[in-house]
Amino acid sequence: MPELPEVEVTRRGIEPFVAGRRVERVDVRTAMLRWPVPAGFAEMLRSREVLRVERRGKYLLFEVDAGWFIVHLGMTGTLRVLPNDAPPPAPAKHDHVDWIFDEFVLRFRDPRRFGAVLWHPRDAGDVHAHPLLASLGVEPFSAALLFGRTRGRTVSVKQALLAGDIVVGVGNIYASESLFRAGIRPTTAAGRVSLPRYERLADAVRATLADAIERGGSTLRDFVGSNGESGYFQLDCFVYDRAGEPCRVCGAPIRQIVQGQRSTYFCPNCQR
């Protein structure tokens, strides 16, 4: 699943192309995604200028004068910028939505169709009040926020990172990597982690996400950036998907456990 770095990599790749450009038309080939593409979506965007593209958690928010169209990549989604040749490149089976500009096509592909393309009209208020965005955690977050919101919670610190209401956009890969960098065992109860340790964790999360963005995200199966290139952060992971391999720091075998139906990787020596 694309996590925050992959979504930010996509945003940075797309915005220079679309900001200040008008959508000539929209082709919706598959309306039944995770939620249905709104009726009349293509007509609402015809000849609209894209003002900017921002990210909130794992959502991409494309602002036009009449509102915002919101894109979520789901489990397997990608947004790619393709040259608008004559004719435009033919869509494949899982290419569900095209935004046609004068010189290029922005194409949404999603084999599993867990992604979404939604519309938030300006007269409905600020887009950040949209039901899918309003409950997301704070960006950027702080150690004090982590510490305060986890008091009394018995859930593991890794599961707290994944919950989305405290820290937004940190998925399974980056939670495991951040906990390793902070030296915190993922099974530790979130409410028992001290403020100094949360300070290390907050720094580790920020550094891990920044490194992942710089490396184009992680490509484990489907993700490619807007230019079609794979990310390579996964090649430098300390613990993720390295069960049984030696720790890059101490040499101890990396362990794998399951938490909340997701695989967790950690070093039993470096993480306490």
Curated annotation (Swiss-Prot):
Catalyzed reactions: Hydrolysis of DNA containing ring-opened 7-methylguanine residues, releasing 2,6-diamino-4-hydroxy-5-(N-methyl)formamidopyrimidine; 2'-deoxyribonucleotide-(2'-deoxyribose 5'-phosphate)-2'-deoxyribonucleotide-DNA = a 3'-end 2'-deoxyribonucleotide-(2,3-dehydro-2,3-deoxyribose 5'-phosphate)-DNA + a 5'-end 5'-phospho-2'-deoxyribonucleoside-DNA + H(+)
SMART domains: Fapy_DNA_glyco, H2TH
Listed GO MF terms: 8-oxo-7,8-dihydroguanine DNA N-glycosylase activity; class I DNA-(apurinic or apyrimidinic site) endonuclease activity; damaged DNA binding; zinc ion binding
Keywords: DNA damage, DNA repair, DNA-binding, Glycosidase, Hydrolase, Lyase, Metal-binding, Multifunctional enzyme, Zinc, Zinc-finger
Cofactor note: Binds 1 zinc ion per subunit.
GO terms for biological process, alphabetical: base-excision repair
Zn finger residue spans: FPG-type: 238-272
List of residues binding DNA: H94, R112, R153
EC id: 3.2.2.23, 4.2.99.18
Cofactor: Zn(2+)
Keyword Transferase belongs to the record: no
Biological function: Involved in base excision repair of DNA damaged by oxidation or by mutagenic agents. Acts as a DNA glycosylase that recognizes and removes damaged bases. Has a preference for oxidized purines, such as 7,8-dihydro-8-oxoguanine (8-oxoG). Has AP (apurinic/apyrimidinic) lyase activity and introduces nicks in the DNA strand. Cleaves the DNA backbone by beta-delta elimination to generate a single-strand break at the site of the removed base with both 3'- and 5'-phosphates.
Name of the protein this chain belongs to: Formamidopyrimidine-DNA glycosylase
Organism of provenance: Burkholderia mallei (strain ATCC 23344)
